[in-house]
Swiss-Prot record:
Its EC number is 2.5.1.19. Monomer. GO terms for cellular component: cytoplasm. This is 3-phosphoshikimate 1-carboxyvinyltransferase. Its main location: cytoplasm. One of its GO terms (molecular function) is 3-phosphoshikimate 1-carboxyvinyltransferase activity. The gene is aroA. SUPFAM superfamilies: EPT/RTPC-like. 3-phosphoshikimate binds at K28, S29, R33, S175, Q177, D328, K355. The lineage of its organism: Bacteria, Pseudomonadati, Pseudomonadota, Alphaproteobacteria, Hyphomicrobiales.
């Protein structure tokens, strides 16, 4: 499997004001999609700013195993020569996606539209995650699961459709991964493939499909939903992609700068896609001093420079419809809530229960062991902010990179140091996290 057997415990201590300018790594969602769409396009796709964490590198290896030419040409610079829609070759060995649900599920969609057989696998964490919700619509399109572990989990062997059928599919939960898998499979189908979602999820796949030359039409559906229609069998053309900085990774230095008094930190080229900025909206509602400037865009994705300063935060209520735009950020938002004055209620977090760990329970445990009063009520997380955090706890990360980073951020402003049992998994999304935070003034040891 992708990860080493060595644990890497670390302690975060009360730090002086953080300061400096940083660019967090490229967005993980865009990085996976650039590699996969580059592999399905004809001609060369040049990618700059690619996130070179383990998850994305596993997707790069998988695309290579499926017949695309994928090469690293420089620092975070990659070239992909694609095989065209439905042009994948059968891989010689199982495709190992390590810890990455996104890479695995999107690749399943892409493979479902090619007449090949491929086996998908991953680490212990990914093997425990649900895959039926992805496979069900792909089977409606003509793909077949010929073998899988209990409950449709990995390792899973998928036989792609020789003649894929376009479908209209209502997603059972707001999930960009389900939507993307159906759209990627729909590339090979004649006619129009439509996905209807009751709550709008991340639209990176739709934007990038258009960047590569596909026809995608998005219409509103109900109060919060969307209807996305893809015209099948396009000729995708290789296109340059500049990967903006990942807002889910920017969340950690952003919250650290807000809770460490006197901090003044600038983060550059952060993606500001409105379906990913729920955390920034929420932190501003809490009183966070966050200034935005230098906005621009690439491959359909907007980005901006942010200046974040130490702030007095207050508790707020976060509505459930905001969850899809910040599902990965609730862990570090809970840390901000612990340092705020007053109660913060985060509603509708059921999707956190099927992430890399049960993130709802793990977040509550991380706060409790450090002296914070927290309650889970159904799918709601309630944090009683006291303006400071006692700290002094050892946090179990459950092989989850975001729990590890959230706990380390908490330790930078807690009264006593916060210890994390293992930071090895941080490499899945943010290999440079510890040194980058240390350059801004964070005290780790």
């Amino acid at each position: 499997m992708s990860h080493s057997d060595h644990t890497a415990p670390l302690e975060a201590r009360l730090s002086a004001a953080l300061s400096g300018t940083a660019r967090v790594p490229g967005d993980k969602s865009i990085s996976h999609r650039a590699l996969i769409l580059g592999a399905l396009a004809v001609g060369e796709t040049r990618i700059s700013g690619l996130l070179e964490g383990e998850d994305v590198l596993n997707t790069a290896r998988a695309m290579r195993a499926l017949g695309a030419q994928v090469e690293r040409t420089g620092d975070c610079a990659w070239s992909v020569h694609g095989v065209g829609v439905a042009g994948f070759a059968p891989p010689a060995a199982p495709l190992d996606f390590g810890n990455s649900g996104t890479g695995c599920r999107l690749a399943m969609g892409a493979v479902a539209g090619s007449p090949i057989i491929a086996t998908f696998d991953g680490d212990a964490s990914l093997r425990s995650r649900p895959m039926r919700r992805i496979v069900d619509p792909l089977e409606q399109m003509g793909a077949r699961v010929t073998q899988s572990a209990d409950g449709g989990r990995l390792p899973l062997t998928l036989q792609g459709a020789r003649d894929p059928l376009p479908i209209t599919y209502r997603t059972p939960v707001p999930s960009a991964q389900i939507k993307s898998a159906v759209l990627l499979a729909g590339l090979s189908a004649p006619g129009v493939t439509t996905v209807i979602e009751a709550e709008a999820s991340r639209d990176h796949t739709e934007l990038m499909l258009q960047h590569f030359g596909a026809t995608v039409v998005t219409e509103p559906e109900g109060p919060h939903g969307r209807k996305i229609s893809l015209t099948g069998q396009p000729e995708l053309r290789g296109a340059p992609v500049v990967v903006p900085a990942d807002p889910s990774s920017a969340a950690f230095p952003m919250v650290a700068a807000l809770i460490v008094p006197g901090s003044d930190v600038v983060l550059t080229e952060v993606m500001t896609n409105p379906l990913r900025t729920g955390l920034i909206t929420t932190l501003r509602e809490m009183g966070g001093l966050i200034e935005e400037s230098e906005t621009r865009g690439d491959a359909g994705e907007p980005m901006a420079r942010f200046r974040i300063r130490g702030s007095q935060l207050r508790g707020v209520e976060v509505p459930p419809e905001r969850a899809p735009s910040m599902i990965d950020e609730y862990l570090v938002l809970a840390v901000a809530a612990a340092f705020a004055e007053g109660t913060t209620i985060m509603r509708g977090l059921h999707e956190l229960r099927v992430k890399e760990s049960d993130r709802l329970e793990a977040t509550a445990a991380m706060l409790r062991v450090n002296g914070v009063t927290v309650e889970i009520s159904g799918d709601d997380l309630i944090v009683e902010g006291k303006g400071h955090v006692p700290g002094g706890g050892l946090v179990a990360t459950h092989m989850d990179h975001r729990i590890a980073m959230s706990a380390l951020v908490m330790g930078l402003a807690a009264d006593k140091p916060v210890r994390v049992d293992d930071t090895a998994f941080i490499a899945t999304s943010f290999p440079d996290f510890v040194p980058m935070m240390q350059r801004l003034g964070a005290e780790f040891g």
